[in-house]
From Swiss-Prot:
It catalyses: a ubiquinone + NADH + 5 H(+)(in) = a ubiquinol + NAD(+) + 4 H(+)(out). GO terms for biological process: ATP synthesis coupled electron transport. GO terms for molecular function: NADH dehydrogenase (ubiquinone) activity. This is NADH-ubiquinone oxidoreductase chain 4L. The gene is MT-ND4L. Coiled coil: none annotated. It is a multi-pass membrane protein. It is found in: Mitochondrion inner membrane. InterPro entries: NADH_UbQ_OxRdtase_chain4L/K (IPR001133), NUOK/Mnh_C1-like (IPR039428). Core subunit of respiratory chain NADH dehydrogenase (Complex I) which is composed of 45 different subunits. One of its GO terms (cellular component) is mitochondrial inner membrane. Its EC number is 7.1.1.2. It is an enzyme of class 7 (translocase).
């Protein structure tokens, strides 16, 4: 079990580093965010199951709900920016300010 937790933590750190490295493109940032949410889901599920927290069985499901909402908003923003400007560079998001 500790090796699984270590691997999931490394997956989260890798996705976080990917977010820092590929921050110029919106699609790459969204993929890294999804990887971070997936590793957080797996780690929270494993923690709850191994420590027998019966009162917090709904936390991973709630995390998945928020991940789905984040993905939907991110993809809507990606489609809007790419249709408006033709690129998915994050520098174009500065043009959306009022």
């Amino acid at each position: 079990m500790p090796s699984i937790s270590t691997n999931i933590t490394l997956a989260f750190i890798t996705a976080l580093l990917g977010m820092l490295i590929f921050r110029s493109h919106l699609m790459s940032s969204l993929l890294c965010l999804e990887g971070m949410m997936l590793s957080m889901f797996i780690l929270s599920t494993l923690t709850i199951l191994s420590l027998h927290f019966t009162t917090s069985f709904m936390m991973p499901i709630l995390l998945l709900v928020f991940a789905a909402c984040e993905a939907a908003v991110g993809l809507a923003l990606l489609v809007t920016v790419s249709n408006t400007y033709g690129l998915d560079y994050i520098q174009n998001l500065n043009l959306l300010q009022c």
